[in-house]
Amino acid sequence: MKVFDSLKALEKTKEFIDWRTNNKEYYLVSLFYISDKPNEIQIDYYNSKKNTITSFNYSKNSVFVVKDSQVMSKTKKELKPLVLEGISEFDNALETALSYKKEKHSKEEVYKTIIILQNDDTITKEGRIIWNIIFITNSFKVINYKLDAKNLELLSQNINSIFSFIQK
């Protein structure tokens, strides 16, 4: 999938242009892909004054807009804008994560893939744009790789049971 082409195409749609006319203070904060919807990408814009996100679910045939959702965050940190200059393509990031998975967890069969391009300030104080790639497996495990979005360096990796995310 060419996510940057999808972003450019979204920005040319009537829905986006009409929305952007009255919402200039919003800026791009994330791109979200889930393998259940292989031809769709969610593109998120953030308003720091309102602490809200407007999401565009974009595919070649449609645009669905979810306006002004409140940001749920424990830290109340302002989301940083995505600067796309020099960012590696989606397909290259996925290929890199799959090679790590093959090397470390080759027996785990992937059921679902989630890929997010986002700023992450848990890695460095100033933040870093990352490809956050999550594989959910048939054996109820979650394999997570965080890759530097520019050079695809592996920044962190972990594997957990999906049940570890359930609050008791």
Language-model segments: residues:
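Long, terminal "pre-/pro-" and other extracytoplasmic accessory regions
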Residues: 1-168
